[in-house]
Amino acid sequence: GPDRPTAVFAANDLSAIAVIDVAREMGIRVPEDLSVIGFDDVPEASRRAQPLTTIQQPMRRLGSVAAEMVFSLLAGEQLDELHVTLPTRLVVRGTTAPPPESPGR
């Protein structure tokens, strides 16, 4: 219907894959009717018949920064930053498209 969303940004890739599966069961076409984006770029995201558009984050760097912070805290050191921002990358694959045209939008 006209109030149906045109896109879903899921918290992670596995949730995005579940959204795609449910959408298809409901007769909703991805990406023609609904764009779906995940987060993490897990291996399954690129191996599907319709590869998932996702946000890739530097997992190894994320782990090493977290470990460095834990070791600093265990050594009694004060952390300069409690929040660290690492770069991400949009990986466009087969589950996103411009929103469909419909009356009233």
Task: Indicate residue ranges for each PLM-predicted region.
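Flexible loop/turn connectors
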Residues: 1-104
